[in-house]
Amino acid sequence: MSCYIYQLPSWVLDDLCRNMDTLSEWDWMQFASYVITDLTQLRKIKSMERAQGVSITRELLWWWGMRQATVQQLLDLLCHLELYRAAQIILNWKPVLEVKSSIPDFSDTVKPGKPLAASVRNTEDKQETGQPVRPPTFPGSGPAAVRVNLPAPPEDASSSLKTNQTASADSKDFSASIPKQETLSSLAGDDLFWSEVDVIQATDNFNPSHKISEGTFADVYRGHKRGTPFIFKKLREMACSGPGSVEKFFQAEVQICRRCCHPNVLPLLGCCTGEQFYSLIYPYMANGSLQDRLQGQGGSDPLPWPQRISICSGLLHAVEHLHSLEIIHGNVKSSNVLLDQNFTPKLAHSMAHPCPVNRTSKYTMMKTHLFQASTAYLPEDFIRVGQLTKRVDIFSCGIVLAEVLTGIPAMDNNRNPVYLKDLLLHEIPSSTISLCSRKMGVEKEMAKEICQKYLEKRAGRLPEAHAEALVMAACLCLRRRNASLAEVCSSVAAVEEQLRGQETSLPCSGLSEGTGSSFNTPEETDDVDNSSFDGSYSMRAAPWAGATSSPPLTADEEGMLLAGGAVEADSSAEACAPPEPPQDATETSWKIEINEAKRKLMENILLYKEEKLDSIELFGP
């Protein structure tokens, strides 16, 4: 079966969209009319070309790909419309295995005037009834047909388990010459293995009354051994998964737990490879998940602010530790942040494991359904491209931070919008002050508006400066593609220390580590989309309270002041001390001030060079 359009590599899709965007309006509309039946939707996509940096072909293919259109369908349409240059871009991606003719032969499945969207719906109907699905072909002038058999992309192996060590032995199937029990025992270690009898006794043979929850790949039970409570994760095969998926999941889970030893990562206490089941054993978390506590499950009291921020700090440090080992969690959400008896957070249920290899239509439909359940914590670029990077974990941490700050669940089908991320991303650029101007206090005003609208009231009183700093930290995770997790950790840690009432000497580098803070030099950012907000802490010039001769603060310094309040400078930090006036005329004077009009012009010129302002806004009033 041909692969789907959304499985095309990014470089192939970029070349294809760049080629199709240069077509004449007539040719492009002719191509699009075969794809979309709804003229309103077609005009909506066509109107996006007025937005700078938006490829209307990419939007069109995204719309079509989400309806499970195949690459073969796209290739047949391009050949039918004689757009051979665009078709050749796809053909160059994979070698052509069989070409019977240079002219495509169209069948009666799709005729001119009958758009491809209808054929996609027919395909979905056949999938539901269990009938075999064949990509539609297009009628042509010749009797022969060209069918380019594009092989499916390689198996999505455990790409998230990026390590410098050789993983070839782990990614292969277990050897037939080595017993399975012996292979897994060498992987996990004898000290971790439980006997099948012990697991059955501890869980009362997995009694349904001991079941806590049901997951995608496992059921979770509570059990006891010698009076100590444990959690047992019983792995199970999915109808849509490929052969050996349980073994691969088990193998990857043990790998991750053995490599990670961190106070905020849920430890693996044992595992069992019985004849009838696979099981993983974890410590029992007395206070459940962060999601349950935020939503008051079981009548629990709301978490106070010191506990909330301490939990966020622990989560960020756990993810930072995983990233230092080149491990991507891929499943960061509030329900996977477990709390022990002391409310210490433990990050659990990593999804960094090999995906099933059986790419049938039922598996694809099931995977899409499961994928939509986690969309609330995933960035838009991952949803479109599907490439798992550290950016996915950082974005998910931003959503968890937002849940803690607002008390609003990440997904609510009775709310508009359904996802919390859409609510925040809509509110960020809709602040009363234009966020593209980089004026003084823009981010502070934006954070203040969000706090006034959505800050959790049941957790008690949180100082305004601390709340704004946490909001800006969450926005940093959500809006900046190259966001540094160390910056977010520094901001949250500063607020945590202030709430604890401890007097600490914070570095003057602020939220950013290793970032230059030269005057009138904007921070380089890489935004997720083309909105005006760049999610970075923009350049400001505000005097430090109490320092009469200090230079204007940069974004990093002011961000730390927002996070930690007014903190006196450490005497050992020379960079924080106000510079002495120059003794002669040859020295650079920090007292030179630029008037506001010239400063604004310089900032606007920088924005103009970044193509964030046009000439009218640059020289306008």
Curated annotation (Swiss-Prot):
Entries under CDD domains matching the protein:
Death_IRAK2 (cd08795)
One Pfam family name from the record?
A: Pkinase
Keyword entries, A-Z: ATP-binding, Nucleotide-binding
Which intervals of the chain are annotated as region Disordered?
A: 113-175, 503-534
Which residue numbers delimit the Death domain?
A: 13-94
Record's keyword annotation contains Cell membrane: no
The residue ranges flagged as biased composition, category Polar residues, are 157-169, 503-522
Chain ranges of the Protein kinase domain: 206-476
The keyword Nucleotide-binding is assigned to this record = yes
Concerning SUPFAM superfamilies, the annotation shows: DEATH domain, Protein kinase-like (PK-like)
Can you quote a single GO CC term? Answer: cytoplasm
Quaternary structure, per UniProt, is: Interacts with MYD88. IL-1 stimulation leads to the formation of a signaling complex which dissociates from the IL-1 receptor following the binding of PELI1.
Tell what the record comments on domains.
The protein kinase domain is predicted to be catalytically inactive.
| Family named by the database record | Belongs to the protein kinase superfamily. TKL Ser/Thr protein kinase family. Pelle subfamily.
Protein name listed in UniProt: Interleukin-1 receptor-associated kinase-like 2
**Gene that this sequence comes from:** IRAK2
